[in-house]
């Protein structure tokens, strides 16, 4: 992995914003609920270890990740809190997870049967996943779920730590399907002879707009990073503070004559003499080609991206001549104007956290406290 520290393009991560988002959500929970920080996918692009540390400082009592490798990275960083792997882990790594005190998601009896042949001394912590309508992983019928739960209660090789589901439409106005999933989940839970330590259903969207369903632990994900999971559909009950900015500088500036074209395919042609600036960032950094025609901020003014975005560079139309080294905001604030990840996502036809997850490791992550670099 090569990190581009010798060019001006970088991601700036506001640690205080991350902590404030977590603290604000914790303040809304009842006294019996915990917040686990979802730091999968490199902390949604913000840095997995750094984000975990910031959220722990703000009161998170555990972490959720997607794959075992992410959990092991947190352990290697010295984090000792509960870590739940939300995806299905190959059963051959059950012993490795147990040895590192990592909790795994289980979605069928066959996995438990095979793990029993592998585990020896240290019990494995497991959460049973229930498919109430996401259609992804988990038990689909009550009978198989109850069989697995009873099996865990009787086994010395497992610690039945939790049970959970995931909602497909918690970030939408229409709650019909959401309510159906709640009903199905409650039916599953009613079959337990004993509830495990954690009964959890809430992702960020559920915790923001359906707090009554929280259970005793919430999986707070995109909200950590100050992004609304519904985009602009639903209003957040508190101010989510964006944690990530994307900044660069002009690497080149030139006056282009009327009739000259810009970038691959010659898809943009100057209709008059124009100042064109080049920015050293491109789709290899996660700033996608489909953002042609969108804008950046320079000197508090929106400047259109002209021509196709290249792998490592892109061009913008300037209102006047600006010198090389002029600051460029691709996401964040400049003067009275701002560009949010949601703005970028809407133009690209996607969701805000796909944008942040897509920024590659070539972009340095710079962490700040109250505007000062750590």
From Swiss-Prot:
UniProtKB keywords = Isomerase, Pyridoxal phosphate
Organism's domain of life?
Bacteria
| InterPro entries in the record | Ala_racemase, Ala_racemase/Decarboxylase_C, Ala_racemase_C, Ala_racemase_N, Ala_racemase_pyridoxalP-BS, PLP-binding_barrel
| Cross-referenced CDD domains | PLPDE_III_AR
Q: Which biological process terms from the Gene Ontology are attached to this UniProt entry?
A: D-alanine biosynthetic process; peptidoglycan biosynthetic process
Record-given protein name: Alanine racemase
Instruction: Report the EC number(s), separated by commas if there are several.
Output: 5.1.1.1
Enzyme kind, highest EC tier: isomerase
Q: Which GO terms describe its cellular component?
A: cytosol
Question: What is the catalytic activity of this protein?
Answer: L-alanine = D-alanine
What's the family? Answer: Belongs to the alanine racemase family.
């Amino acid at each position: 992995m090569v990190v581009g520290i010798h060019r001006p393009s970088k991601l700036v991560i506001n640690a205080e914003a991350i902590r404030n988002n977590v603290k604000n959500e914790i303040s809304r929970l009842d006294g019996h609920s915990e917040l686990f920080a979802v730091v999968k996918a490199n902390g949604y692009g913000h840095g997995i270890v750094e984000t975990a540390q910031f959220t722990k400082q703000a009161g998170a009592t555990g972490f959720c990740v997607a794959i075992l490798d992410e959990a092991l990275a947190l352990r290697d960083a010295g984090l000792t809190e509960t870590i739940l792997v939300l995806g299905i882990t190959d059963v051959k790594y059950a012993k490795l997870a147990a040895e590192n005190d990592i909790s795994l998601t289980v979605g069928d009896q066959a996995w438990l049967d095979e793990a029993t042949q592998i585990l020896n001394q240290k019990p494995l912590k497991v959460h049973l996943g229930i498919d109430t309508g996401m259609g992804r992983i988990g038990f689909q019928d009550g009978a198989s779920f109850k069989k697995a739960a009873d099996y865990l209660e009787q086994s010395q090789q497992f610690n039945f730590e939790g049970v959970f589901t995931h909602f497909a439409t918690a970030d939408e106005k229409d709650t019909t399907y959401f309510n159906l999933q709640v009903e199905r989940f409650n039916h599953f839970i009613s079959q337990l002879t004993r509830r495990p330590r954690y009964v959890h259903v809430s992702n960020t969207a559920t915790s923001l707009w359906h707090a009554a369903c929280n259970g005793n632990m919430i999986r707070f994900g995109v909200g950590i990073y100050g992004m609304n999971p519904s985009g602009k559909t639903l209003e957040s009950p508190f101010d989510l503070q964006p944690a990530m900015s994307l900044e660069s500088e002009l690497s080149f500036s030139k006056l282009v004559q009327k009739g000259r074209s810009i970038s691959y395919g010659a898809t943009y042609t100057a209709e008059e003499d124009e100042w064109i600036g080049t920015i050293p960032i491109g789709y290899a950094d996660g700033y996608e080609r489909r953002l042609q025609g969108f804008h950046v901020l320079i000197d508090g003014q929106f400047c259109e991206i002209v021509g196709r975005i290249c792998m490592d560079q892109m061009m913008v139309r300037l209102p006047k001549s600006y010198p090389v080294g002029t600051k460029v905001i691709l996401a964040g604030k400049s003067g009275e104007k701002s560009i949010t990840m949601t703005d970028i996502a809407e133009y690209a036809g996607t969701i805000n956290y796909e944008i942040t997850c897509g920024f590659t490791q070539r972009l340095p992550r710079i962490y700040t406290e109250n505007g000062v670099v750590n």
